[in-house]
């Protein structure tokens, strides 16, 4: 999926650079001091969780389900945290993993491991192109979606393929058509509950079709 600038010739790129530099200079001249970070909760929202800072002390019992949480803990995450996640997600705690606080880091590591090592005994994704006459590995990207998800696959050289996002999740007719016809498609970026940025939640039918479709 080419960007707008990748489709431009040299003259068009030069003109675009001049235009952007002029616009940047105009904004800088205003001497604004803006926080452009995205997704930051308001101070009021952060304040809701502040009482948690007072729950533990050096004398607190840090054992949870037989796990010493002051030490390395366990791979799946501490039991009470998994139970809480299961409650939020509406699933049994045994179906949850509680890892680091950054979902983006977990997603990056998962895709990078597939790229380097493959899945379930299959060849690494990085070897796909050489074995298929130069065809690229692809990832479906429901749009609008989270650009930093798309940046992970793009950074690895994976081709992002946009799929229309609906209020019930990705357009499953299009998803099923694409994956049935192209073995280079290895995955799809999904935020099934409160999708970023639309806030939509995937319908039960969308989830069923995602988990049962032929690839």
What do these predicted ranges mean?
Residues 61, 67-215:
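Conserved core of the PLP fold type I
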């Amino acid at each position: 999926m080419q960007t707008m600038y990748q489709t431009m010739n040299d003259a068009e790129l030069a003109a675009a650079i001049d235009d952007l530099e002029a616009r940047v200079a105009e904004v800088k001249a205003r001497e604004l001091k803006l926080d452009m970070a995205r997704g930051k909760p308001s101070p009021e929202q952060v304040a809701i969780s502040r009482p948690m800072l007072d729950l533990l002390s050096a004398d607190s019992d840090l054992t949870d389900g037989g796990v010493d949480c002051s030490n390395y803990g366990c791979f799946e995450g501490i039991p009470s945290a998994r139970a809480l996640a299961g409650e939020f997600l509406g699933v049994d705690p045994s179906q949850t993993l509680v890892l680091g606080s950054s979902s983006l880091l977990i997603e990056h590591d998962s895709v990078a491991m597939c790229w380097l090592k493959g899945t379930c005994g299959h060849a690494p994704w990085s070897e796909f192109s050489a074995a298929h006459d130069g065809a690229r590995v692809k990832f479906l990207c429901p749009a609008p979606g989270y650009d930093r998800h798309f940046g992970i696959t793009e950074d690895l050289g994976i081709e992002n393929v946009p799929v229309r996002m609906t209020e019930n999740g990705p357009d499953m007719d299009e998803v099923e058509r694409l994956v049935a016809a192209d073995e280079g498609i290895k995955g799809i970026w999904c935020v099934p509950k409160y999708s970023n940025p639309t806030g939509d939640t995937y319908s039960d039918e969308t989830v069923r079709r995602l988990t049962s479709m032929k690839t």
